[in-house]
Design a protein with these regions (language model features):
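C-terminal cap/loop subdomain of S1 sulfatases and analogous C-terminal strand-loop tails that border
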Residues: 1-7, 11-13, 34-35, 46-49, ...
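Short Pro/Gly-enriched coil loops immediately N-terminal to beta-strands
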Residues: 17-23
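Structural micro-motif
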Residues: 23-27, 49
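The feature captures the short pre-catalytic strand/loop hairpin that immediately precedes
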Residues: 27-35
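Short, solvent-exposed loop/helix junctions and linker helices
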Residues: 39-46, 63, 133, 137
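Long, internal low-complexity/basic segments
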Residues: 48, 117, 127-152
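Intrinsically disordered, low-complexity polar regions and short flexible loop motifs
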Residues: 120
Length: 152
């Protein structure tokens, strides 16, 4: 009778900023969809707004935080370099920013976590608990800049 199933824990499922809480599979089929298989593009729920509007004939490439993912239905492309999420649980606000390779979680209390989403997709090894490689430090700097820009 557990809500969380391995490899997730009660702290890394819905209601959290870990992949178990914010990653939702999306299945798309229909007229004009000729791609098959799986795609790991960074899509957020707001992207549905512009995508549906475009499919209904409304023109535009970006409305507020919504980006159309229609190009993904027919070709292997990228629509988003970063994916942003935030959580307010009433006691400690927290924010997450990720790109295809890394994810940074920042809590209002100052705690930070960083994960390699390629080699550690279940976020078991917080990279900030040890010295970062040059590549990891560079990625952290980029994620921090993007998070700061989004939150302004």
């Amino acid at each position: 009778n557990q809500a969380a199933q391995s490899p997730y824990t009660n702290q890394t499922v819905k209601g959290s900023l870990y992949q178990g809480g914010i990653n939702t599979p999306m299945f798309i089929s229909g007229y004009g969809v000729n791609r098959t298989g799986m795609d790991n593009n960074l899509i957020v729920s707001t992207d549905l707004y512009l995508t549906i509007a475009n499919l209904c004939g409304v023109q535009g490439t970006q409305i507020y935080d919504s980006k159309s993912f229609i190009p993904l239905l027919t070709s292997n492309t990228t629509i988003r370099d970063f994916q942003y999420s935030e959580m307010d649980n009433g006691t400690n606000d927290s924010w997450a920013i990720r790109n295809l390779n890394y994810k940074l979680i920042v809590n209002a209390n100052g705690n930070e976590e960083m994960y390699d989403m390629i080699s550690d997709p279940y976020e078991q090894n917080n990279l900030l608990l040890s010295n970062l490689s040059n590549d990891q430090q560079s990625a952290k700097n980029i994620l921090e800049l993007e998070l700061s820009a989004i939150r302004q």
